Amino acid sequence: MEKIRNSMKRNRTLLAALVAIRLLSFSSAQAESFDSASHFHQVKVVGDKVFLGTHEGLYELVSSNNMKKIGSVVFDVMGLAAIGNTVFASGHPSQGSSLPAPVGLIASGNLGKKWKQVSLAGKADFHLLEGAGKEIFGADSGSGNLMYSSNLGKSWQTIGKNKFSDIAVIPQMSGMAIAIQGKELVLTEDAFKSSKTIKTPTAFSQIEQTNSGLFALSGDSLYRSKDLGETWKKISPFKGSPGILSANNQIMLVTVGSDIFVSSNAGLTFKKVS
């Protein structure tokens, strides 16, 4: 899962780090600079590519200070999620766009080149969008509601007002997720119809689920849990307070101020890349 809701400066720091570890190897001749986008809402790793959800549409990072526009559809990408090779998005249409306002949920099976309407056209604007397997959680900015789909967004249930700043979907069991609510973690096994508080050694700011376990940031350290948050182990301390945690099953990235650290062994060791 990647969840980035920080300033433009921090997003650019994340992008620089991803380039440094050579996730991408494209020519910058076909790209636009970061200055062509007013601001970023989302940064997501999709396979071996890095996607940027911006005010001007969806872009792919192609070099340290360059990106290229994906597809011809321009919209303000507020929510972005990837499940396998399918990209899901939500947001607002640009002027002159044929998309509904708000967009609802749209999906692309060819990495953003073309989009199809999935559901909630003109009804939902998801700013938080997280998914795994066939499940998607979305926080609609208009109503303030947390919504849940068990069939890749085709139909939805309204859970209630959203109380969470981040959600990690656990794909091993339908309806299971762990979320950050204030200073607490909560676990659900029925898509937040009910939930229980997980006792943790500290308050977490961001949370990610990979094949190696559940990862979270707190204070100056990265923590890992191998039992769905019941117990935690501090695995990597940093000199300073980490700001961003982004991970897939191959790579994990943590920023500390202007420094970027990358791990290829599930957070056990990190290498400073800039």
Question: What function would you assign to each model-found segment?
Answer:
Residues 1-9:
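N-terminal secretory signal peptides that target proteins for export/translocation
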Residues 8-11, 18, 26-274:
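Extracellular glycan-interacting surfaces
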Residues 3, 21-24:
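Compositionally biased, low-complexity segments
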